[in-house]
Structures are given as C-alpha cells and as structure tokens.
Amino acid sequence: MPSGMFSIDNILAARPRCKESLLLPQNGPLLFSSLGESLYGPADYSGFYNRTVAPTSALQGVNGSRLGYNNYYYGQLHLQTPVGPSCCGAVQALGTQQCSCVPSATAYDGAGSVLIPPVPHQMLPYMNVGTLSRTELQLLNQLHCRRKRRHRTIFTDEQLEALENLFQETKYPDVGTREQLARRVHLREEKVEVWFKNRRAKWRRQKRSSSEESENAQKWNKSSKNSAEKRDEQAKSDLDSDS
C-alpha cells in the first residue's frame, strides 16, 4: 500500500478512545447494577433473561456471586486475553489503581474485578451475557452511557392557535377530543396531551400570580386610604388646637 494511503483500520486505530469506561481483565467479574425486576435469570448466565422475575429482595446472588457495594451484582465473564481501553493498552492486574482515561465514577473492588455502569434493563431480556464479545460489551456500555436528550416539539402558529382555541373551551379535553384535534393539526395525541398539561400548569401559575397581584393592590389601596384618613384627622386636630 502506498505511503500516502491509509486503510479504514489504520484511520480508526489512530483515534484515541479514552472515554471508554469498560475494563474487562482476564477472568474478571462483570458487575451489573441491581435493577430490581430486570436482573434475574438462569444460574450460569448462559441462557437468556426472558422470564418473569422475583422481587429485588429475592435477588441475593446469581451463580454463587455476591452482592457488592452500591447494589452491584458480580458475575464471571471469561475472556481469552486481558483487555482495556485502547489508550491504556492491555490491563494485566487491576487493583485499587484507576486508569486515567476512565471516569472517576468507575471503581474497582479488589484485584481482577471491574465495575461498569448498569446495563439498560430494556436490553437484559434479550441478552446472552456469556456470549457477548468485547466489542459488543463496549458498544452496550457506550449506548448506556449516552445522555438521553429530550426532544422538544416545535409547534407551528396554526397548531398553537388550534390548541389555544380548544384550551379556551375546555381545560381538560377528553381523549376523543384530543385525537380529533391531533388529526386536524397533524400531531400525535400524546403531544397534544403533554401540551395541555403544560398549558394548564402555566395557566395556574398565571392565575396564582394574578391573585397575588390583586391582593397586593387591595392591601395598598387599604393602606393608602388609612393614611389619607390619618392625615385628615391630623389636619382637623391641628385646626382645633389653633382655635
């Protein structure tokens, strides 16, 4: 291959991936968070977690494993070679030290063990943990660590006008009314429901603020009236004393 050309593997290998927080030493235990009703399955991790689960109190151990600190479950995951983030190289023996590229939230519990973030409970029913490769585990870890961003709906002027008009008619439209409006303005019924919930909260805040302003105005008027009466009485008293 000419010196000026690079393969895809060379390009990808040149990029440091120091944000990888998954360290899997050889024969080291894999730690899963206590997920209540989510983490429960066959005793050897070799089957799929697809059955009805027991309460959290019944989950005292899996495959003879113990419950670690912060409600993390320990389970054995066997790898052929010690691995770690590409920026750290091979990990031989993990003790209490921590790699500089791993976030401080990642902690270790003795030599040969590693703590990774909890696995999303939606994925557990479809996982066969014992057969996952290093790449798959890293991908799973990255998907879990990715921040969830809230999608904010941007309403058009026509949609806002239709929503406001219905809000003036009723503050609590039923499902049928919401669905009818949603079809008319090309929105999902769930979006209409959320909009009305937020609009009612705004309406209550405005109503409370208006009520407080009215009370303050009444207090001010009453105070002004009392002050005027006191001034009149004082002026009358001064006139009487002069006479």
UniProtKB/Swiss-Prot annotation:
DNA-binding region: 148-207
PROSITE patterns: HOMEOBOX_1, HOMEOBOX_2
Intracellular or extracellular location(s): Nucleus
Main location per the UniProt record: nucleus
Induction field: Induced by activin (even in the absence of protein synthesis), lithium chloride, nodal/nr-1, nodal2/nr-2 and derriere. Not affected by basic fibroblast growth factor, and repressed by retinoic acid, and by UV light.
UniProt function note: Plays a central role in executing Spemann's organizer phenomenon (the dorsal blastopore lip of the early Xenopus laevis gastrula can organize a complete secondary body axis when transplanted to another embryo).
Protein name: Homeobox protein goosecoid isoform B
Organism encoding this protein: Xenopus laevis (African clawed frog)
Gene of this entry: gsc-b
